[in-house]
Amino acid sequence: MSWDVVARKEFRDALRSKGLWVLSLVFTAFFVIPAGAALWWDVGIRGGQEVGLQLLIEYIYLNIVTLFLPLVAIFAGYAAISKERTSGSLKLLLSLPHSRKDVIIGKVVGRCGVVGVPLAGAFIVNALFLIASRLTFKPGLYVTFALFSMVFALVIVAVAVSISGAVENSLYSIIGNMTFFVSITFFWNLWANSIGDGLGEYLGVTGAANWTTVLFLKLLNPSQAYKTIMNSMLGDGSNAERLARYRMFSGGNNSEQATICSDVLAGNATEVPGFMGNRTVCQESAQSVPLYFSDGAALFYLLLWIGLAAAVSYYTFNQYDL
């Protein structure tokens, strides 16, 4: 096993590159600007000092992480292998006692380090700003947010490097990576809903079976899996996990919402008066959320992308005649 040699070389090369320092500045700017706003203005304060950090994470930081962090992660990983293939240095690397599997694993681990180190630094600097602000700083909540955000970023890096190993050059790699980014950011939920509509219209799959399929497909989206885990962590009480899954559905009539709550998420669906008429709310019940929709399952689906991407990349990379 020599993948660790490849990983160390990848990271050392990045330390000598200006790219790592640019990444550090980008990460820091993304996170410190909202924290600075909380320090000097009233961003996050209107909900109260006690819940200000939750509001800042839920409405600002989660959007920053899911929209901008994948772009930075893709920038860090899209040319990891394809660039060396084009330049010919990959042949030299493989002439050493490294297998193609070692190269894939080493490149993934090395680029994860390239992204993880500046991201960790950005979280530390950002924490100092938040501590100095008028918000009530909650170390446990912030550390949880930082850790899951790093996991999400590293998953995207692993996918980016894997795509780089599966294609012939960096142009194809950036096209593949940007297609992946656009899909998980803008279109995945639309596709999941369309599949649910198709199951109902053409196969007669309706009710709980239909909504279970749609929710499962949505959770397979790494961006959505990360976001719903964080929404669960930000919620209060034992019903937070259920409400985090429930809020993944918007619209629909009260009957559909009741089915999602009671028959899919094992909750207690109750109608309450609302501004536009009665609406269905999903309250706590004696049953817990089904295991395959739990936070642990969502985390498993998120990490599954690493193995899936690496397997596809290794199979494709192994077929190429360098």
Task: Place the predicted regions along the sequence by residue.
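Transmembrane alpha-helical segments in integral membrane proteins
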Residues: 70-85, 300-322
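Hydrophobic/aromatic residues in alpha-helical transmembrane segments
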Residues: 73-77, 125, 159, 175, ...
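Aromatic- and glycine-rich beta-strand/loop motifs that create alpha-glucan
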Residues: 1-27
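Pore- or pathway-lining transmembrane helices of multi-pass membrane proteins that form conduits
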Residues: 21-25, 170-188, 200-207
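Terminal transmembrane helical anchor/hairpin motif
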Residues: 41-44, 186-299, 304-307, 311
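Transmembrane helix-loop junction
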Residues: 13, 83, 96, 127-131, ...
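Secretory targeting signals
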Residues: 33-40, 47-72, 110-172, 176-179, ...
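Helix-loop-helix units of permease transmembrane domains in multi-pass membrane transporters
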Residues: 77-113
